[in-house]
Curated annotation (Swiss-Prot):
<dbReference type="InterPro" id="IPR002683">
    <property type="entry name" value="PsbP_C"/>
</dbReference>
<keyword id="KW-0809">Transit peptide</keyword>
<keyword id="KW-0604">Photosystem II</keyword>
<keyword id="KW-0602">Photosynthesis</keyword>
<keyword id="KW-0793">Thylakoid</keyword>
<dbReference type="GO" id="GO:0009535">
    <property type="term" value="C:chloroplast thylakoid membrane"/>
</dbReference>
<comment type="similarity">
    <text>Belongs to the PsbP family.</text>
</comment>
<dbReference type="GO" id="GO:0009654">
    <property type="term" value="C:photosystem II oxygen evolving complex"/>
</dbReference>
<dbReference type="GO" id="GO:0019898">
    <property type="term" value="C:extrinsic component of membrane"/>
</dbReference>
<keyword id="KW-0150">Chloroplast</keyword>
<comment type="function">
    <text>May be involved in the regulation of photosystem II. Required for high levels of photosynthesis oxygen evolution.</text>
</comment>
<keyword id="KW-0472">Membrane</keyword>
<feature type="transit peptide" description="Chloroplast">
    <location>
        <begin position="1"/>
        <end position="57"/>
    </location>
</feature>
<dbReference type="Pfam" id="PF01789">
    <property type="entry name" value="PsbP"/>
</dbReference>
<dbReference type="InterPro" id="IPR016123">
    <property type="entry name" value="Mog1/PsbP_a/b/a-sand"/>
</dbReference>
<dbReference type="GO" id="GO:0015979">
    <property type="term" value="P:photosynthesis"/>
</dbReference>
<dbReference type="GO" id="GO:0005509">
    <property type="term" value="F:calcium ion binding"/>
</dbReference>
């Protein structure tokens, strides 16, 4: 199934299934009927975040040049229309639109390879499970991983299939359920290309259906070298905090 998925998905080498699945992490949300922004405030409080000024919230502590740093958590809360999450404090907003339906995009101050996008698309589905299995859903959003642009003959070397210059490995796949019973599909992949740039790129993808009949997708990309130099903490903190109402 994994091989068929990869061939249909983005013409790369087979996606390797993980040997085991990690324990699901429950994303908790407030059970009371409160506004989206109030819910985020409660969530941020639970995460022990110190509130920042508007400039800090938009640009992180690096923008706080006239006073001492007040946010020591490394994250700032963000409340969107229908979703909420914690953003790495030193990431900046970006106006690029990598994919259709992007409603939020942030990128690392130091390396734009590291970025986060939130996508919202209208759907007639009521829950993420209505899209089918996790494999089937990943296939349907394979455009998020990019397409192979090169066309030509190559040898089967370096872990790449013949005539392929990119490959993806599925490192982890899981489902999580929040306090309100909403289910999320979550994936972690490592995508490599023949040029060996950054040793590959880690891709975190999460998805669920909101109460407003929209499919919400979060995608976080981190270069492999930066992943192991501390960016993993930023990526996972944002990824695990993603909540849809």
């Amino acid at each position: 199934m994994a091989t068929a998925l990869c061939n249909k998905a983005f013409a790369a080498a087979p996606v390797a299934r993980p040997a085991s699945r990690r324990s699901a992490v429950v994303v908790r949300a407030s059970g009371s009927d409160v506004s989206r922004r109030a819910a985020l405030a409660g969530f941020a409080g639970a995460a022990a975040l110190v509130s920042s000024s508007p400039a800090n919230a938009a640009y992180g502590d690096s923008a706080n040049v006239f006073g001492k740093v007040t946010n020591k958590s490394g994250f700032v809360p963000y409340a969107g229309d229908g979703f909420a999450l914690l953003l790495p404090a030193k990431w900046n907003p970006s106006k690029e639109n990598d994919f259709p339906g992007v409603i939020l995009r942030y990128e690392d101050n130091f390396d734009a390879v590291n970025n986060l996008v939130v996508i919202a698309q209208d759907t007639d589905k009521k829950a993420i499970a209505d899209f089918g299995s996790q494999d089937k859903f990943l296939e349907s959003v394979s455009y998020l991983l990019g397409k192979q642009a090169y066309s030509g003959e190559t040898q089967s070397e370096g872990g790449f299939a013949p005539n392929r210059v990119s490959a993806a490995s599925l490192l982890d796949v899981s489902t999580t359920t929040d306090k309100k019973g909403k289910t999320y599909y979550k994936y972690e992949l490592l995508v490599r290309s023949a040029d060996g740039d950054e040793g590959g790129r880690h891709q975190l993808i999460g998805a669920t259906v909101g109460s407003d009949n929209k499919l919400y997708i979060i995608k976080i990309q981190i270069g492999d070298k930066r992943w192991f130099k501390g960016a993993k903490k930023e990526a996972m903190g944002a990824f695990d905090s993603f909540t849809v109402v």
